[in-house]
Amino acid sequence: MENDQFMCPTDIITGIVFIDGELAMLTLTADGELRWTEYGLRQYLSMKKDVLGFIVEGKQIRVKAVVEKEAGGICCGQFGGDFVRKDFVFEPLIDQNGWCYKLRQYLDSLGRPKRLLVFVNPFGGKKSAREIFVKEVKPLFEDADVQLEIQETKYQLHAKEFVKSMDVSKYDGIVCVSGDGILVEVVNGLLERADWRNALKLPIGMVPAGTGNGMIKSLLDTVGLRCCANSATISIIRGHKRSVDVATIAQGNTKFFSVLMLAWGLIADIDIESEKFRWMGSARIDFYALQRIICLRRYNGRILFLPAPGFEGYGQPASCSLYQEPHVSDKEVGYQGPETKFEDLEWREMKGPFVTIWLHNVPWGSENTLTAPAAKFSDGYLDLIVLKNCPKLVLLSLMRQTSSGTHVESPYIVYIKVKAFVLEPGALVDEPDKEGIIDSDGEVLARGKRTYKCDQKALMSYDKLQVTVDQGLATLFSPEY
């Protein structure tokens, strides 16, 4: 039989196989494609993009793959939207072991994770994480032959406590089936380890199963994928990685490590006070935002910032002295924040009253909120959004525009990039005996006088705090970009 049209000197393996009871020539090419002809049509599967794994069933080899839901066919080199699982079965006439060896060798060369620690948060959002994991996530990992250690979180900070003491050598990565909260716990736990430098090499993956899902939305949206569990899981299986900036929020000796955002004023009030409507799911945000805009609060205070190049004209010149902790060995106490000296640089300031202050590390704050459209994962800067005053009807329109990111084009919005930031929060303009809430990554960072009381304990006092950023400090599983 003439095989020239299928073979070239760089092919890894080629041979005659049965596919659906018909003889065909199957080739694994050097660039990682399985190619064959079926019913007169040339077909292919990309080992990198389509194939999850394979199993042997008697004389047959069953290749586990994912295909684009809209495509309807086996050819699926380019993805967009949801994926569906699809098997490709063939039976080699000879050398089944050779096929298995070459397939395994190629998959192993891709550097995909083989052992993952998985946190499932059964309490987040609509409490659907367990079901999402069992029905959508676990089957994909099984197809890819990934070994899982599953930990259901039982209380707040459970994930943080676990990663602080775990043996990092046991895993190739960590997966959070939750909203953004478990991701933040994991990052803080890794950074508080004595071996934080080594621990941070462990990539973290997210599967959306909570209320916010801002980080995974930002990652998937970058390459045009929908924010859904199977897209996120497949991105983890493929094993591509990218670095992400980590912000250190400090008040005296107290520190919190943020990968998403810090908010004060309107946005923090909506995020935290809407917890009483958690049963509504993500709709609680829109519902409570309307209430808060109707009864709009304005806060006294001051912000100072170190602008990125090109943003030096915003605000007024100011001097700023950041708190510097006495030098101690980070081998004993964990990560202490970036070591950059900021005091002699050209700081700027803005004074209140403010409606809201929003500091963002990635583009999306949630699945429906494109807070900072110009934000980058590892540029070493945070995106600062300032709203000082705004008519209520205009503000309602701006809140709707956050779904597309066009709110930052408003003349009422100041949108800049900063390297460091200081917040000096004050009381409400109309109620001087009432203060506000400072929110970071969806958690209460500080709570002032006469504010909404919730189950979350504040880490810091309602006072001056500083934010610095360390470029590309943490590692995330990511779609290929």
UniProtKB/Swiss-Prot annotation:
<dbReference type="GO" id="GO:0005524">
    <property type="term" value="F:ATP binding"/>
</dbReference>
<keyword id="KW-0067">ATP-binding</keyword>
<keyword id="KW-0346">Stress response</keyword>
<feature type="binding site">
    <location>
        <position position="153"/>
    </location>
    <ligand>
        <name>ATP</name>
    </ligand>
</feature>
<feature type="active site" description="Proton donor/acceptor">
    <location>
        <position position="180"/>
    </location>
</feature>
<keyword id="KW-0418">Kinase</keyword>
<dbReference type="InterPro" id="IPR045540">
    <property type="entry name" value="YegS/DAGK_C"/>
</dbReference>
<feature type="binding site">
    <location>
        <begin position="441"/>
        <end position="443"/>
    </location>
    <ligand>
        <name>ATP</name>
    </ligand>
</feature>
<feature type="domain" description="DAGKc">
    <location>
        <begin position="111"/>
        <end position="253"/>
    </location>
</feature>
<keyword id="KW-0547">Nucleotide-binding</keyword>
<dbReference type="GO" id="GO:0071215">
    <property type="term" value="P:cellular response to abscisic acid stimulus"/>
</dbReference>
<dbReference type="Pfam" id="PF00781">
    <property type="entry name" value="DAGK_cat"/>
</dbReference>
<dbReference type="InterPro" id="IPR017438">
    <property type="entry name" value="ATP-NAD_kinase_N"/>
</dbReference>
<keyword id="KW-0926">Vacuole</keyword>
<feature type="binding site">
    <location>
        <begin position="121"/>
        <end position="123"/>
    </location>
    <ligand>
        <name>ATP</name>
    </ligand>
</feature>
<keyword id="KW-0808">Transferase</keyword>
<dbReference type="InterPro" id="IPR050187">
    <property type="entry name" value="Lipid_Phosphate_FormReg"/>
</dbReference>
<dbReference type="GO" id="GO:0070300">
    <property type="term" value="F:phosphatidic acid binding"/>
</dbReference>
<dbReference type="GO" id="GO:0009705">
    <property type="term" value="C:plant-type vacuole membrane"/>
</dbReference>
<dbReference type="GO" id="GO:0009737">
    <property type="term" value="P:response to abscisic acid"/>
</dbReference>
<feature type="binding site">
    <location>
        <position position="271"/>
    </location>
    <ligand>
        <name>substrate</name>
    </ligand>
</feature>
<feature type="binding site">
    <location>
        <begin position="210"/>
        <end position="212"/>
    </location>
    <ligand>
        <name>ATP</name>
    </ligand>
</feature>
<feature type="binding site">
    <location>
        <position position="284"/>
    </location>
    <ligand>
        <name>ATP</name>
    </ligand>
</feature>
<dbReference type="InterPro" id="IPR016064">
    <property type="entry name" value="NAD/diacylglycerol_kinase_sf"/>
</dbReference>
<dbReference type="GO" id="GO:0006665">
    <property type="term" value="P:sphingolipid metabolic process"/>
</dbReference>
<feature type="binding site">
    <location>
        <position position="185"/>
    </location>
    <ligand>
        <name>ATP</name>
    </ligand>
</feature>
<protein>
    <recommendedName>
        <fullName>Sphingosine kinase 2</fullName>
        <ecNumber>2.7.1.91</ecNumber>
    </recommendedName>
</protein>
<dbReference type="InterPro" id="IPR001206">
    <property type="entry name" value="Diacylglycerol_kinase_cat_dom"/>
</dbReference>
<feature type="binding site">
    <location>
        <begin position="178"/>
        <end position="181"/>
    </location>
    <ligand>
        <name>substrate</name>
    </ligand>
</feature>
<feature type="binding site">
    <location>
        <position position="278"/>
    </location>
    <ligand>
        <name>ATP</name>
    </ligand>
</feature>
<comment type="function">
    <text>Involved in the production of sphingolipid metabolites. Phosphorylates sphingosine and various l sphingoid long-chain base (LCB) products, such as phytosphingosine (PHS, 4-hydroxysphinganine), 4-hydroxy-8-sphingenine, 4,8-sphingadienine and D-erythro-dihydrosphingosine, but has a very few activity toward D,L-threo- dihydrosphingosine. Is required for abscisic acid (ABA) signaling that mediates stomatal closure, inhibition of seed germination and root elongation. May function upstream of PLDALPHA1 and phosphatidic acid (PA) in an amplification response to ABA that mediates stomatal closure.</text>
</comment>
<dbReference type="GO" id="GO:0017050">
    <property type="term" value="F:D-erythro-sphingosine kinase activity"/>
</dbReference>
<dbReference type="Pfam" id="PF19279">
    <property type="entry name" value="YegS_C"/>
</dbReference>
<keyword id="KW-0472">Membrane</keyword>
<dbReference type="GO" id="GO:0008481">
    <property type="term" value="F:sphingosine kinase activity"/>
</dbReference>
